[in-house]
Amino acid sequence: MHPVLRQMRPPPQQRQEQEQRQTCRAPSPPPTASGGATSAVDAAADGDYEPPRRRARHYLDLEEGEGLARLGAPSPERYPRVQLKRDTREAYVPRQNLFRDREGEEPEEMRDRKFHAGRELRHGLNRERLLREEDFEPDARTGISPARAHVAAADLVTAYEQTVNQEINFQKSFNNHVRTLVAREEVAIGLMHLWDFVSALEQNPNSKPLMAQLFLIVQHSRDNEAFRDALLNIVEPEGRWLLDLINILQSIVVQERSLSLADKVAAINYSMLSLGKFYARKIYHTPYVPIDKEVKIEGFYMRMALKVLTLSDDLGVYRNERIHKAVSVSRRRELSDRELMHSLQRALAGTGSGDREAESYFDAGADLRWAPSRRALEAAGAGPGLAVAPARAGNVGGVEEYDEDDEYEPEDGEY
């Protein structure tokens, strides 16, 4: 039944209640004009009677409308949009990756065979074929029905396409991460220091200062245990691969300064591809290596390259440069009126003196330090030729040091 017609029917619970009331109710004689009115009156007196038009309006109010108007639906299965979605939904295709799914459960080289089979079947598969009942009858020669062969071929093609899409996404993600890291200046500086450090450690593996620095560097890599172990054993044979990787990345990122950013990303990808092929052939002792194993080794080197670049970014932040912080004028304390008048008086008194003495008033906050005037020193008994010292230098000529808590009284002629 169409969902629009299905929602016109009363809910199942109400239908059951109506059927129970009808079965429990005693059979009545054939309705007459007076009898129909009497039965309606009796039903109304019992409280079970509801006019058909009102009952239909009640059912329609529950399931008609949009959004919140449908909250009165008895169950999610009877919700109109849920029914439409269920009737028109497409078949769910689970995600598959022939290279990485079901680790350790596939026979050797079976992933490689499935991948190449899906690639070859992709061109000859009829995607619009509709299976009929006669297609499920087994063939007399092969014992396999055409429908079974078509479904198996479709599964291989689907697995191949999904595997290719996932590997494309992985490669795009790697390129974006490498491009972002290589574009940072800190990565080049940190990679240069890291390469210099591992080269010095390789020449002098028993140096205690270098080993102490190694432990400090290892503290920056806390996510990947394989990378930490290789970094701790970088001078040993089992950590030689990491030393080669650092040398390759250093030659691309640090040495080749004339390369563009896109060329550096391409060079790093080519290096990962070459390293993956080399070590895959070294493992299998043959030029032929299953493509799934080669892809896994390349993926391992890609992750390790990202670890090296991220570590270089962390190390490049530590620079021996002096940081100058610009302090805004608004963050300084405002001069009070008393300090402003003192500074003005000192500036006026210093007019005509040497430039060096005039500049010293405003250097390093000198304008905020009070010093007694020449007239005050003469009145106190000090000689006119006595140099005026700052208040922090102690008492000068028997005059006590000025305290900020003391109230300032202007002298004669001062305003």
UniProtKB/Swiss-Prot annotation:
Subunit structure: Part of the genome packaging complex composed of packaging proteins 1, 2 and 3; this complex specifically binds to the packaging sequence on the left end of viral genomic DNA and performs packaging of the viral genome. Interacts with hexon-linking protein IIIa; this interaction is required to promote correct genome packaging.
Keyword Nucleus attributed: no
Composition-biased stretches (Low complexity): 381-394
Keywords attached to this entry: Host nucleus, Late protein, Phosphoprotein, Viral genome packaging, Viral release from host cell
Start and end residues of each stretch annotated as Disordered: 1-55, 381-415
Residue spans of biased composition, Acidic residues class: 400-415
The organism of origin for this protein: Human adenovirus C serotype 5 (HAdV-5)
Pfam families assigned: Adeno_52K (PF03052)
Family: Belongs to the adenoviridae packaging protein 3 family.
InterPro entries for the chain: ADV_PKG3 (IPR037536), L1-like (IPR004292)
Ranges where the record places region Interaction with packaging protein 1: 1-173
Induction cue: Expressed in the early phase and late phase of the viral replicative cycle.
GO cellular component: host cell nucleus
Something else known: All late proteins expressed from the major late promoter are produced by alternative splicing and alternative polyadenylation of the same gene giving rise to non-overlapping ORFs. A leader sequence is present in the N-terminus of all these mRNAs and is recognized by the viral shutoff protein to provide expression although conventional translation via ribosome scanning from the cap has been shut off in the host cell.
Keyword Cell membrane attributed: no
Site, Cleavage: residue positions: 351-352
Cellular location(s): Host nucleus
Protein name per its UniProtKB record: Packaging protein 3
GO process terms (BP): viral DNA genome packaging; viral release from host cell
Post-translational modification: Cleaved at different sites by the viral protease during virion maturation.
Modification Phosphoserine occurs at: 75, 360
Purpose of the protein: Involved in viral genome packaging through its interaction with packaging proteins 1 and 2. After proteolytic cleavage by adenovirus protease, L1 52/55k protein is removed from the capsid during viral maturation.
